[in-house]
Amino acid sequence: MENIPPKVQNQLAMLQQMQQQLQTVVSQKGQYELTIREARRAVEDLADVPEDAAVFMNVGSVMMQKSKEQVLASLNERIETLELRVKSLEKQEKALQGRFEQLSSQIRGALEGKQQPPGPA
């Protein structure tokens, strides 16, 4: 690492930081997508439930009885919100991926340029 110029060392540190950010974004996106799938499954299951059936919903740490209509509205709102977050995270992921690839390329170029033996003068 001592042979590597300080500028490249800084770029390597930035690259590691970007990689961590990218992993965080991908992880969050995966969690949101899982929650969306679960909510959609709940909506599908509620389609078979009679309108006047007792439906329960978690509100914080308490389970409360709500109308089917209220639960469906809540689930659909949650799905919509999470889908917006996923789209935002996808944009963030794409931007980070682009910057990551660009910085990787710069670092490779700097290291390859440094490692090349001096040519004939």
Curated annotation (Swiss-Prot):
It is found in: Cytoplasm. Its main location: cytoplasm. Pfam families: Prefoldin_2. NCBIfam families: gimC_beta. Heterohexamer of two alpha and four beta subunits. Molecular chaperone capable of stabilizing a range of proteins. Seems to fulfill an ATP-independent, HSP70-like function in archaeal de novo protein folding. This is Prefoldin subunit beta. It comes from Methanoculleus marisnigri (strain ATCC 35101 / DSM 1498 / JR1). The gene is pfdB.
